[in-house]
Amino acid sequence: MPEICPICGLPKDLCVCEEIAKEEQKIKVYVTKRRFGKLMTVVDGFDADLIDVKDLAKKLKDICACGGTVKKDSIELQGDHRKKAEEILIKMGFSKDMIDVR
């Protein structure tokens, strides 16, 4: 018996909750200064119930070749990676209209 998704009620292999969630999320990508004047790119606005933020952070860190962490449903990447992060999020299925890069 296949597992049932608790959100949509469909079997896990037919579930589209994550794809729908990717299209509806309003994601903000911005840079802040941290200790000693270092820059940090913050990717914020994920719904942690629908998207695996830790897995997404791992993919972003691997592709950007930088360090980073997950804090309160936001991803922090070391350095200025705004353009690269936007391109990666679009390739992962997030809507370009819903990504706000500052």
Curated annotation (Swiss-Prot):
Keywords: Protein biosynthesis, Translation regulation. One of its GO terms (biological process) is formation of translation preinitiation complex. Belongs to the SUI1 family. Pfam families: SUI1. Coiled coil: none annotated. It comes from Methanococcus vannielii. InterPro entries: DENR/SUI1_TIF, SUI1, SUI1_arc, SUI1_arc_bac, SUI1_dom_sf. One of its GO terms (molecular function) is mRNA binding. This is Protein translation factor SUI1 homolog.
